[in-house]
Amino acid sequence: MSAAEKLAADEKKPIGQPTGQPTGLVMLLGALGVVFGDIGTSPLYAFKAALLHFQDDGSVINRLEVYGVLSMVFWSLVLIVTVKYVLLVMRADNQGEGGILSLMALAQRVANPGRMRYWLGMTGIIGACLFFGDGVITPAISVLSAVEGLEITYPAMKDYVLPIASVVIVALFMVQWRGTSIMGRVFGPIMAVWFLLIGLLGLLAILHHPKVLLALSPGYAGLLLIQHRLLAFIVLGSVVLAVTGAEALYADMGHFGGRPIKQAWLWIVLPALTLNYFGQGALILHDIKALDNPFFLLTPHWLRLPMVLLATAATVIASQAMISGAFSMARQCVQLGFLPRMTVRHTSETEQGQIYVPQVNSALLIGVLALVLTFRTSDNLAAAYGIAVTGTFLCTGILAVVVFRRQFGWSRRSVMVVFGFFFLLDSLFFASNMLKIPQGGYVPLVLGGLLMAMMTSWSAGRRLLMSRWRQDSLPLASFLARLPQSRILRVPGTAVFLTGNPDYVPGALLHNLKHNKVLHERVLFLTVKTLDQPEAGPDQHLEVEELAENVYRVIIRYGFKESPNIPRDLDALRARGVPVESMQVSYFFGRETIVAGKAPKMPLWRLWLFLVMARNAVPATEFFRIPSDRVVELGVRVPI
């Protein structure tokens, strides 16, 4: 095996796994630190936000309302997280990888060609856009709710909550470029202590008021809906805050595998969350004034400051998981053709999944700070939280229907009964959250809408661009047929021409012949393709075909979670009999200047957006890791 092939094999090891096989305990601890940060910090604000609705009219909260909300929270955790995600959706892995885009690719693969694939793609894009909208809110509400614990211990610190939260958030984003390998080692133990402590505090409160366990019955949720009707429906919009982060269980399967995530949820996280929520309920039944901040008032006075510090650490971990997820999602969107090329920096020599995307990091920092300074408290931010989460739930359910029907062979009746129930439940949560739009729910919708416009405009623009290239290009077969009779001067060396379509002559080659009137003695037509799976298999990755003497067609395939590295992969061609030294070849690129045509084929606002993104896209040389001193760029003006 060549050095290049060995490096390629090393980069294809499962993400997040070191060279040695990690033990089950290590993987379980890792899952605690990465997967459950968001849902694990929900007790800081979810239960309080739900109960506050019953105080809006000045009335006193009664036992039924406490029991009803607890019942809703518990059964949401059971039905949405445990049944839907852990038992069902996590079965639909794409070669071990999860997440909305992996599920979209899987659904498109088993769907019939045509409009169905298009709409499945749109569903996946909507889910991805909502994920980014959620990613802006999660760090803001999590860090704010943790720092607000200072008010309980030191009331004089109230005016410092906002500055402290802002400093924590800025510091979190400013260290992203260094990666998370060092911090990641302590994430698991910190979250293990977090879940142990919040579960223990909840248990102690339950022991003082054991009747609160009656709320385990779903009957109390039903009674609340019957008695309060519209108000109970509104409360659902806050109850869903208890299950934010459920999507992470599925999205992070590629890092840890399904089994450690399921074990961590069933053995540690679900029991700890249940105990803490019911402990908060017991405390409020004992003292209604505890509603000011039931999570921190559950903690003994002497432990509150350490608990604030631990909560801040836990919310930073939750935010870090969301930020890392946004980086990974952005890379997948680029690879799948939904966003322009971005700078992707690897922050670890051993773990492929640890990346840093500067553009995404800056956008998230600006968005999170804007939310913190605008909404100012976690209670206010709770109104903006939930729409993106429930929208993602709906998108996941729609895509799962196709996978379970087509790939797993479920009967139409089984799919309708099982996923019809969850579609109804998710729709109730989503509809309830839509009522939050005037209070702040518009935030994730606006963010998601902007991203949706960007993704669809970029995808449509690239299709138009490819169509225009095909119109103006020469079929490769015709070019090769004329090559032996041509009087083109051949010069020493190897030239690599990148082309989006392997059956047509690259525009850069035609421009090179037009202006320089020479052709290298060895020519490679290189096409890079992205597969609908996380990683390309050894038999898929590299394809070589000799079209004529010293003229080759090379196709390199990457999975949507892989980062392209063309020089490395070209070195592997030597094992296929192609004498190529990647650092001694010339790479020819067509640097297109895209302009509006006389009769644009897309709306002007979409065209403007596409042109802006195209001009700000990372150069192909940087994206494909090609040394700039080996590149020849030839300008091409392309009207669309």
Swiss-Prot record:
The keyword Transmembrane applies. GO terms for molecular function: potassium ion transmembrane transporter activity; symporter activity. It holds the Pfam family K_trans. It comes from the Bacteria. One of its GO terms (cellular component) is plasma membrane. It catalyses: K(+)(in) + H(+)(in) = K(+)(out) + H(+)(out). It is a multi-pass membrane protein. Its main location: membrane. The chain crosses the membrane at residues 24-44, 69-89, 124-144, 155-175, 186-206, 230-250, 265-285, 307-327, 355-375, 384-404, 415-435, 440-460. It is found in: Cell inner membrane. Keywords: Cell inner membrane, Cell membrane, Ion transport, Membrane, Potassium, Potassium transport, Symport, Transmembrane, Transmembrane helix, Transport. The keyword Ribosomal protein does not apply. Transport of potassium into the cell. Likely operates as a K(+):H(+) symporter. Belongs to the HAK/KUP transporter (TC 2.A.72) family. This is Probable potassium transport system protein Kup. It comes from Granulibacter bethesdensis (strain ATCC BAA-1260 / CGDNIH1). The gene is kup.
